[in-house]
């Protein structure tokens, strides 16, 4: 860029005919006169730093700074002072002369910043620059501390820095330190300020060359169209528009350095980083040209745009597509098969759960020889002599009959409804004869037992009649199925022509007596053993009772639909479900286990049950921790209360002692309302009576394990 500046400065001189060399240095006053305006703050910082650096490092010779004309700017960016033309005879101490130079430099910089302004006009400076000039200008060299200080002594400087800043700048080092501290990188202060001074020098030469060229152009225009005499003073032409051109030049340089905005949307944000002064604007423009940071316009060739430039991007893309091989039709394309998604472990488990459990097929010859099974629990799980009361094996053998082969002991689970239907169908197809229509019922109660006795008696009486007699009455649907003897039971189920009628009083007497079935005939004894054991009623669990009770309670709640307030209070648990007493606002009443309704403490009973899942707890193992706390004024049925109290007796044993294997893991107490207590007491009583009947009934050859459950007459729900 020095070449550009030099060429610009030499052009007017070549035009004038005098070939003068480019100046190597310029005074600060010449720079101010060329620009016709003061220097900016960045240039003032640079002149101060470079001036202190140049004055401190220059060899001997007396140098004085009286005005801006004594400060010299050089092409390489250094700054010096003009030598004193007249020799001085007075000897000045080094420290005193350095302080005077610092003070004179501060005055000169202030005049450069205030150059061209009126007397009543003052320029606003930044606080840092104003403080620096104030410290440099107010340094008094006649101070006693200044005259007595040694050149190599830096004690006061350290004290001043420790106090938060110097009170006066008397040395070049102090001024340079303050100039460097304002930069983000104090270590690069020398390079930065040298670049600023170099740019100021080069731009001044370029501006002076530009103004000289403008002045020469105006003179040429005046000579070509001059009609007035040439005695017009040349100074008037020189000063014509000089300030305007200088101002435009400074504005142009600023825009080239800081960037140009085509449209000012908002004010430029303050950039804390210093402006780059390593290159002049022309050098930066040349660097952009070399790096091709520009966009070229369309160039016409022979009055037309070249064909490669004329085509737009869309046409080029179409040409490229046409040059490629043709694509296949969609119908001809074959996609790869979708890879089979591997099922996760969670999906496999869900699929196994959804699938029905498949049973292993059993031969038809074993269906007739099986008993009615046992309860759904494992007999082998009970170790020692203590057997689970829910594991009952009813498959017995009859050794008294020579024509019947012994039945194997098989432990079966209670079949489902679908399996029972299949078993009934297969038994009807295989059995050629059937005399008594009997079917097991899941809820086998005392009423069903009495009905079974009457139906069996009537069936045997009809079997004793001739073949042309009346047809025996059919059993109620859903409770018993038609029983027909198999081939192995021919010994005790004779054909109508060969069978001998039994006395009509034999079966009722044997059915009415629980302890004396041994005296009955083998046929009657077999029928009693097969159909008098309500096995599936023993398999009734707490979970099933809870489901039944919920259905009943839901039906009972429909009665209160007319009274919406009562129905809402019962549903939300605001009142007791038994006594209709209202609960306090911030209370937490207990909830019944079976009906899930809120109940007060006076209407609730603590029920004892094993610490197991509800689906694994037989209902006959439940007990009550305390008697039912029901006042006599409540509308509780008297029969239910009497049935509950009749279960108590002088000889009682707790449920933990009766069922130690079930209560092996402890027990829990649950709250039950009085209504559900009566319901559960009836279910438990019926279940235990059925178990008593089962235990009191003798087995063939005594091969089955009896239940360790005492009589209900001496049983207590505890």
Swiss-Prot record:
Keyword Protein transport among UniProt keywords: yes
Protein's UniProt keywords contain rRNA processing: no
Region of interest: Spir-box: 538-558
Gene Ontology terms: biological process: actin cytoskeleton organization; actin nucleation; cleavage furrow formation; establishment of meiotic spindle localization; formin-nucleated actin cable assembly; intracellular transport; polar body extrusion after meiotic divisions; positive regulation of double-strand break repair
UniProt modified residues of type Phosphoserine: 374, 443, 445, 479
Location within or outside the cell: Cytoplasm, Cytoskeleton; Cytoplasm, Cytosol; Cell membrane; Cytoplasmic vesicle membrane
Acidic residues composition-biased segments: 419-432
Membrane topology: Peripheral membrane protein
Biased composition (Low complexity): 10-21, 496-513
Residue span(s) of domain KIND: 26-207
Entry's family note: Belongs to the spire family.
Name of this chain's protein: Protein spire homolog 2
Organism: Mus musculus (Mouse)
Gene: Spire2
